Amino acid sequence: MRSLSKNIWIMSNFEVLLTTLTGDRDAGGCRYWNGSFEEPLSPGETATYQFYADASHPNSKYVINDNKVIFKEPEQFGGDYRMFTIIDTELGRSEQDGRYIIATCEPAWYELDDDFIENKRPTDKTPQEALDLLLEGTRYEGEVDPDLQMRASDSFYQVSVKEAVIQFFQTWGGYFKDTIEFDGNEITRRVIKSLKRRGAANGVRFEHDKDITSIRRNITGYPKTALYPYGASLEMTDEDGNATGGYTRYIDIKDVVWSKAAGDPVDKPAGQAWIGDPDLLKVFGRPMPDGSLRHRWTRWQNEDITTPEELIEAAYYDLINNVSKAIVNYNVEVAPKNVKLGDTCIILDREFATPIELEADVIKMTYFTDRPEEGATIELGEYLNLDDIERQIGAINDRFKKNEGKWNTGGGITEVTDGAFPDKKPPKPSNITVKSMFQSIFLSWNYDPSSYIAGYRVYASKTPGFTPTDNDIIFEGKMSGYEHKVGNNETWYYRLSTVNYHKTESDMSDQYSAQSERIMNDDILFGAITADKLANLAVTADKISRSFDEGNIFPGSLLKPSQFYDYPNTKHSVTDKTFNELTITQVIDDSTRLRFGISGQNKAPNNIQRMPLEQGQIYTLSFEVKRNNTTDLSYIHLKKPDNTFMLLSSSLKDISAYPSDEFVRVDLQFTAPETSSKFTLGFGGYNRNGNVTPCSFVIRKVQVRKGTEIKDYGYSPYDIMLVDGAIYSDYIQSAAINSAHIADAAIGSAAIQNAAIKNAHLGTAIVDTANIKDAAITSAKIKELSADLITSGTINAINITGSLIRGGRFEPLNESSAYTSYIEGDKIYQRVNTINYGGTPKKTYNDLTITSGGVTMVYGGRDTGTDEPLREMTLRDGSLYMSGNKNDTGYSEIQMYCNDDDVVNAPKSIFRQKLGGVNRMSLHSYYNSVPGSYNVQMDTRNTSIYSHFANGWQLTADGKIMIMSKNGQGIYLDPSNDNVAGQVTMHVGNAGQAGGLIQPVIAGAPHYSITDIHGALQTNMSVMLYQYNFVMPSKGDAYASKYNDIPPPFECENIFMVVPTVFGGYSDHVHATITSQSSSGFRCYVRGTGSSTGILGRTFQVRFLIFYEVN
């Protein structure tokens, strides 16, 4: 009866059963093999499943990406259904398996990576309650072992559910396993299990030469024998217990005294800042010249510990149980046994110089689902050395008896939970800085190491003066900085707080703000006015457009000091920067005036009181303000020569929440009170400190735009383009523009487009007869023109339409001496002279001649005054000729032609390359009438250059193949002479050896008894001789051994056989064997024969004869 545990089920992405693949070789249907399942004990490591399937079977079409794969674990490995998702497929072919498809899969529970948790904070929850909360809304449900009831708390903020599940096991413990329930047709349940443990301590033993196929020990880390412990940094207080704002150094154990006589584990005198263990010193200490042993120290810290007595207890416990332990993992291949992931096993291999005798957990397991009876490869970790068990148990018993009374009463050590810390209101974050960056804003603050502080919160909003809520939290954690990812040119406002372990929050910090930066360039900065737009006569009608509806319509956006005037008790100044900053300062005199401010100038020559507004239209005023000590900025208004209109700016009556030393963007919408082009803006505020101290503020980036859309700042076209009043005395010095700057005819027709100069720009009778010269009125100005009006002269710039134009020579009208072109008879000719600038100028020309017989193109130089052809191409008589400069030695030529039209000679096509007029390579394709066959010949007799084929050369013939040099040496292939069908003899040389013996170049074929193990030969078999040195152990007996895993010294597809030979002194006292081999290398053992201990410490040279398949 077929085992269902060897089947795998394929379901669609929508989980419809598509087909079943079988792992039984003799069963019908679509077969799969090498179903390798690797599962780690930790959910943080990725489980993988990969299998091969028969690609020639029609049902293999279902093995595609995103489809699901289900298999049932063999009972000895758990018996649960497991589900995976296909993430990659690869097609292949081999002689052994034919066409196949390889599918690589990842665990199906990884779909939880697509589910997102914004903010979940299970507090004081059991594992079942916490896991249910995390999986809420997903297709998975949690199942926790009833024995796991430890309550804990954790925060899951902006993470995927997959990440949250991994974090869950780190906080609440337990062992992870994902399973499904499957009835053979559909999935009825998906489960994330938290088990008390996986596997069991069932005493399974694996021994060398009995159960263990191979074993590797990996040791990392260095054990320490003593620690320098440090705890928390405590808040400093005065004599009354009030916090002074400072913190102590990290607490240490200098003042703690331990005495073994008093029941302590070890002796530790006062003044000693470290704690060590004498037993560890004896085992791991470093020997000194005087015979003493020196501790191996390291730093150890737990900032949650606030007393020296608790600190030394915790440090010593960690020293004994963790810090003094090396990290050891074992990779073991074992014969089939009833062992599962998580089992505690005993491994025995005493043939190592340092015998392996250990007890360890299975932390990773790999087996094949189609042949589980072959056993598994397991990886072991976190072991307990059996030689140390008795000593450690004794030490633990002694320590327990000595400290039983202390530990029964708690000994001053309690479980550290969130509730163990004082519920003290923490101070708000200090030294907060906010830095603008491109598409982000970085915040930093001082980190407070106090043990009772759980972390910090950052609140953010685009609204100034916002009240922080949980929805505004963008960061929560125990760090001293955070980068907030935002868009370009965005303004954000921030407030920060500190939180303790009881969720008690500090007072909020002041509000901070910043605007993310954008990349500035001249187009942004100067409105895309570049040098080519300011060239002579380059200002045309389309550049004097007056349609500024989409831009900043406020004249004065440059914030020039002369563009504004002061109200009473006010003065202003401008700081020149990338964006000018206008400072408005109150001047306090004997009056009680509180209001101060400025307005746009309305007097020539700096008049900016000319902003156009339409009654009823909504506009948006935007600017940035740094308030300094001003808290009321509500005196913002529109100004006309005869009237003032206050803007609704109640939000600016109290701006005390704005940072005093940072710019904050302000956006105000208003409706135009009337239609006029004489508006400007006024900016002002009120002194709210009783006129004790003068107030001031700074503005920049002022703009007014039509509509309600808030846009990035841009300069006003009224300030940077040529419009009425845009150029005034600030830009024009006395007599700076005079007649010398306006040359005759400098304003030509190109600069005066249709209607560009309107009546308003032309005075009465400004154009008179004196300005209309002879022939100044062209055909464009004449509506009709008949032939009788043309009696002589030249016809310029017109179109001639008709059926026939006759003439001996036609030339285009052009005004460039560098260009020549004409049509004459059967000839069309064009020539262009050019000059290349790039270092020394080089004069060149391009010449084209087209006749009825051919086309000639010439590229040449003319630096000497005489044309010198450099490259020439001619197409004539159906042939192509290309050459370099024929005046140069060794010039190059390429000729391509055919003579199919020649009835005398046989048809022939030729491709010829020449150097200096001599044939260097000819490729002929011709018909030979004598043998009656088509032939191709390559002739390179006049060259010593070899032929190079970068990616290979395939030569195929229906008959014989001969490759021969001039002296008769070469290779001759003649299938017709073979005695065995399908074989080809490769001959080397002309006559072979004496007696007519022909040596084969290479021959080799593995028997099926070999290919059934290693796979069939796909390419060539080759032989390699290789040498490797083996250094024998310096200690042991005459049976000592040494092995090496030797990677292949070449790329290979497979290794079929390795023959080792030991040579040199004492080589007759050892023998070499090969224990394993694959395409990745082989393992060789050199063992003593028991006849001599002279092999110890000796280096043996081992030579290998390797039969392999070329990759």
UniProtKB/Swiss-Prot annotation:
User: Gene Ontology terms, cellular component aspect?
Assistant: virus tail, fiber
Alphabetic keyword roster: Host-virus interaction, Viral attachment to host cell, Viral attachment to host entry receptor, Viral genome ejection through host cell envelope, Viral long flexible tail ejection system, Viral penetration into host cytoplasm, Virion, Virus entry into host cell
Gene3D superfamilies for this protein: Galactose-binding domain-like, Immunoglobulins
Q: Looking at the keywords, is Ribonucleoprotein present? A: no
- Among its keywords, does the record have Mitochondrion? no
GO biological-process terms attached to the record: entry receptor-mediated virion attachment to host cell; symbiont genome ejection through host cell envelope, long flexible tail mechanism; virion attachment to host cell
Compartment(s) where it occurs, according to its Swiss-Prot or TrEMBL record: Virion
What Pfam families has UniProt attached to this entry? Prophage_tail
Quaternary structure and interacting proteins, as annotated:
Interacts with host Yueb receptor; this interaction triggers viral DNA ejection.
Function summary: Binds to the host entry receptor YueB and triggers viral DNA ejection. Binding to Yueb. This interaction initiates a cascade of conformational changes at the gp21 C-terminus causing disassembly of the tail spike organization and opening of the cap region formed by the N-terminus of gp21.
**UniProt note: domains:** The N-terminus is part of the distal tail cap. The C-terminus is part of the spike structure and is probably involved in host receptor binding.
The protein here is known as Tail spike protein
Q: Which organism is it from?
A: Bacillus phage SPP1
